[in-house]
Amino acid sequence: MNGAESMLETLINGGVEVCFSNPGTSEMHMVAAIGKSDKMRSILSLFEGVCSGAADGYARMAGKPALTLLHLGPGLSNASANLHNAKKARSPVINLIGDHATYHKKYDAPLNSDVIGLSGPVSHWVRNVASAETLPMDAAEAVQAAMVQPGQIATLIIPADCAWDDSVAPVAALPRQRNALAEDAAIDQAVALLNNGRKTVLMLSHGALTEAGLELVDQVAQATGAKLICDTFTPKLARGEGRCEVERLGYFAEQALVQLEDAEQMIMVATKAPV
């Protein structure tokens, strides 16, 4: 089993089901591994920005880790605009970036670039694979990093020889980090604010905007009179008949000031103060 095959089985073990790909020659062993598998769906895109945008959308809507397969630094660069969006949305996305073989890097081929440097601005977690033997564990840790709640961008840079050399057995899924619970003191403070008679805004995002989350915040709003507002750019918002009304914060400051002019206090739920 070569590195690409063991890596793919490791990704499948971690719950990855779909790969949005725009590969080149450096990724052919990864393409071959996907082609042999009936557990990984591969979707070919003709532009890397489509790969990253589709991966972001899939991760948001399905709540599952999405996979991209991109060719070298230029391919990553073409995908970066939508990876920026995915990072801001905290979508669970794993990028597999092929690179020149370790022994070929020194020749500075035409498409050679600083892939690590290009990865940083659009990733929460970056790793450059050292060998075929470490690749399966690197892949398992990439999935683990991507699934840190509410989601992260994990980028794995894979030199071609690490994909085609003989490797070790696939790695089982690693434990996922549990959602951090609000501290008791923060809950007590929120309850006190909601009951002090002042006009309150609940600023919402992420888990607070799921169907279950909206049911809870609606109960709070009805009991306390709090106004419900969500971030201007929300990763996902459950909508439809029977759900509570949530205002989206205006993009321009003038709009937001009108929405917030009566507010005396604000409680952030799964988000941060508006910028």
Predicted regions, residues:
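N-terminal alpha/beta PP-like core and its mobile active-site loop of ThDP/TPP-dependent enzymes
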Residues: 1-275
